[in-house]
């Protein structure tokens, strides 16, 4: 999913940096999952709807964005998130210290034990994005966001579509992921 010429995933890189309750788009979309909304007029409640991307694949989603900073400079950001059923015997995310398992893990630049922030090194981001998508990164004055869902599970996605169409004509685009999406 690619959205160009938008503000992108703005805001601070880590929740520890939040001031005056200004989380920005990055933290709200990527990191604030399973946290109650406390802002007046905020939509949703716990942010669980954001995990819908994880249901069509293996649970891995990459978020890439390029924003224009207040200084006028541009910054690229890349972070990955993995969501799994933490109750499954095959779960991969280990329990951390004495906390309950949440089934959510983030990947990026390690800042300290069990903490990461998005990668901002443009050359590193370019390699990763081109490997996963074959698409170019945002350049020059271009801003926007890409949500990348690698390893879409065709058997999990397409049978649902085909079941809904059993009584009707089976459409060509319901048999190929790239045509369906």
Describe each model-derived feature in a short phrase:
Residues 1-72:
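Flexible ATP-lid and adjacent glycine-rich G1/G2 motifs of the Bergerat
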